[in-house]
């Protein structure tokens, strides 16, 4: 709880607007208690964070992530239920990569979030840059427009590791990254990725822009 409050403080100092919150430990897929206990813990912790974020004018967006990264909040309807239990201004932050895994209909999930959607993370179904997989970006953006979403599309690609001769992007992995902290290295590894070369990262960023800019 204190860590997220510290993040809220940092975002405020950087003149940011919103903090996305995964209300569980990423990578932990075994429950700690009974469902009703864990729900109570989550609501209690989020309410404390929410009270602080409200006091400094920062929005919270509860983000559901896929079942292989957490057992707790995986779908948009779960995130909405938690947001409503926390407070009237608590929002949700959806992620196209996770939605592709967990939602029966990702477009309906977006529609259900109308009025509570405060952030949207974009990556393709393979977690590469938008346009490098099979997600329908034209329909995704159109659905966001339909519900009146006019906030940021946060590009959050996390390219999968491929250390085999079949790697379609040779020389994409940075074998000797400079200035990468142990925490950043662990974050990348926890997400099935690694440090990538500057050229590869630039290509992913360029592809994201080429895919999304014509739609917005």
Name the predicted role of every residue range.
Residues 61-62, 93-96, 154:
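Generic enzyme active-site microenvironment
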Residues 23-27, 64-68, 96-98, 124-126, ...:
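Active-site-proximal loop/turn and secondary-structure-junction residues that shape catalytic pockets
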Residues 9, 73-91, 100-216:
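Histidine-acidic metal/acid-base catalytic patches
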Residues 1-91, 103, 187, 202-204:
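Active-site acidic/histidine proton-transfer and metal-coordination neighborhood
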């Amino acid at each position: 709880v204190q860590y997220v409050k510290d993040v809220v403080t940092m975002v405020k100092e950087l003149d940011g607007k919103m903090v996305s919150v995964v209300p569980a430990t990423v990578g932990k897929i075994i429950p700690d208690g009974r469902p009703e206990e864990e729900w109570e813990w989550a609501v209690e912790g989020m309410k404390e964070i929410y009270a602080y974020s409200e006091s400094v004018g920062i929005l919270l967006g509860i983000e559901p992530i896929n079942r292989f990264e957490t057992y707790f909040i995986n779908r948009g309807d779960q995130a909405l239920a938690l947001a409503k239990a926390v407070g009237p201004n608590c929002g949700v932050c959806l992620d196209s990569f996770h939605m592709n895994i967990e939602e029966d209909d990702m477009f309906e999930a977006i529609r259900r979030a109308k009025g509570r959607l405060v952030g949207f993370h974009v990556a393709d179904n393979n977690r590469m840059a938008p346009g490098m997989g099979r997600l329908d970006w034209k329909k995704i953006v159109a659905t966001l427009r339909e519900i009146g979403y006019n906030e940021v599309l946060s590009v959050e690609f996390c390219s999968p590791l491929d250390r085999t001769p079949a790697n379609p992007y040779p020389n994409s992995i940075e074998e000797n990254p400079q200035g990468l902290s142990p925490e950043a290295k662990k974050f990348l590894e926890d997400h099935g990725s690694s440090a990538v070369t500057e050229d590869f990262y630039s290509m992913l960023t360029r592809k994201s822009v080429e895919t999304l800019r014509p739609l917005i």
